[in-house]
Amino acid sequence: DRGLAGHLVEESLSFLRRRAADFLGISETQNLLDQLEQVWPATVRQVVPKPVTVILLADVLRRLVEEGVSIRDLRGVLESLAQVAHAEKDPLNLAELVRANMRRALTHQLTEGGVDLEVVLLDPMIEDTIRGAISRTAAGSYLTLAPAAARDIVRSVQRAHESASAPSNVVLTQPDVRRFVRK
């Protein structure tokens, strides 16, 4: 039955898209680099293995893919890393910096080539609350927001989303709080 087969293919593709980061390891990253090096050898040699190891690059790519960010422009990813990797080694921060450099491609993806992008803009007071609840340790940064405050923030974003003239799945925040809002 073609309907069942089509549904099975769609479900399989959907699963693979959601879990794509699980299939991106060190070997796959090295394969991507080998392919890119055939076309852009100087770009690859400028970034890998110094200042970015294949292990670190795999971690950054995985984080981007987990968020649905296309890594099709691997050259652009490497060029972004070349600009910041000498000063930054945290894969979370590197992924955020690469993501910010890919803003045009992300916007194009979200607007499907259109001009307008409807967003929910996070209130600066909420951002300040989140910013104040970020704890930084040697092991990384984490959010120490009280559960009640977290629920209030989520409700506030949901209300803003529901009252928008054209509902959006995009919540616009300052870069330093974005990954905590995303969670």
Residues covered by each model-derived region:
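Membrane-embedded alpha-helical signal segments
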Residues: 1-183
